[in-house]
């Protein structure tokens, strides 16, 4: 299937660990025979001015812009399939395949966190995420999703727009009604899991492995987490330890 993989990040001052993620996707595309497109900050030119005035440059604007890029890829560039991968997704296994029986699919994460402050107990929640999005030509979900995102932001109070409002939170709500095809091989790591990976193991990592439907082959490293809690050396340690996730 003629496939384009789309990614976006700023063109300058790319953190070394983000570059490693981008390189892992490039290798994966070469192995799979996919074409790849990288878009810089010009991605925000695809978002209506009124939308940008409300959200600014950030994940909420990117959530809509990625849908515009995917629509353009399928409608006007001759591709049968478009796959979006966030810039902070690291592909562990270049032989990973993304497939689904329907016309679209989204990622599924097992998010491990403290069950209640002070208890020391962990819980794992399965969530839908859009760090990976797969759409095929003729998909009816794509235009519906675009219109839904615009409608939500148009009516939203600018002071109460949450980062995941039209991304994971919207998809999780729609999934309960639509039952999307999911791609659990592209997961995500929480702060607790990240700390265990750097340490070489721990209860959060063990719980993630236990609750994963299939071994993860790619991971959203959550740039906001790394930027706020880790320096570049720790980010390198995290990436070096990721193979722990497929050794169970």
Language-model features: locations:
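N-terminal anchoring/stem segment of glycosyltransferases
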Residues: 1-62, 77, 136-140, 156-159, ...
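Alpha-helical context
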Residues: 4-5, 49-50, 67, 121, ...
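Glycogenin-like
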Residues: 8-10, 17, 91-197
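A structural signal for short, well-ordered beta-strand segments and their strand-loop junctions
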Residues: 36-39, 81-86, 105-107, 182-187
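Short, Lys/Arg-enriched charge-dense amphipathic segments
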Residues: 57-69, 104-112, 180-191, 203-218
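GT-A fold catalytic core of metal-dependent nucleotide-sugar glycosyltransferases
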Residues: 59-114
